[in-house]
Amino acid sequence: MLSPKRTKFRKQHRGRLGGVSTRGNRICFGRFALQALEPAWITSRQIEAGRRAITRYARRGGKIWIRIFPDKPITVRPAETRMGSGKGSPEYWVSVVKPGRILYEVGGIPETIARAAMKIAAYKMPVRTQIIVATPIEMQNQ
């Protein structure tokens, strides 16, 4: 599962999920992509589940690019703990995803297989998604 090797600080504020994605919203590497339509936190487990679904369906063919990385630590307090006594310890990592963000890209496989693989991965995501195809101009710029 994905997680940072080291961070400057162990804990982070939760933050807000406002606005749309201004970066990472265009196809850069592959021909087909899975794009988020809602804001959410996507955990490293969910990212890995989606990656496995795509690679298993594609069966060695083509290449997959994961365009998100879980760099936000989420802390959890122990069960039945009284109020106070500080913030909990980091439990898992999430990626903050805004609408328009590309989650996965796939290239080197036929469109039917790519669409089916992306659909399986989309079921594993906590957000509504859409499958987009790179235009010929975008393919030239790669």
Swiss-Prot record:
Lineage: Eukaryota, Viridiplantae, Streptophyta, Embryophyta, Tracheophyta
Keyword Iron: no
Subunit structure: Part of the 50S ribosomal subunit.
Location relative to the cell: Plastid, Chloroplast
Family: Belongs to the universal ribosomal protein uL16 family.
Name of the coding gene: rpl16
Database matches in CDD domains: Ribosomal_L16_L10e
Record key words, sorted: Chloroplast, Plastid, Ribonucleoprotein, Ribosomal protein
Any one annotated GO CC term: mitochondrial large ribosomal subunit
A biological process term (GO) from this entry: mitochondrial translation
One Gene Ontology molecular-function label: rRNA binding
Name of the protein described by the UniProt record: Large ribosomal subunit protein uL16c
Keyword Chloroplast part of the UniProt annotation: yes
Gene3D superfamilies according to UniProt: Ribosomal protein L10e/L16
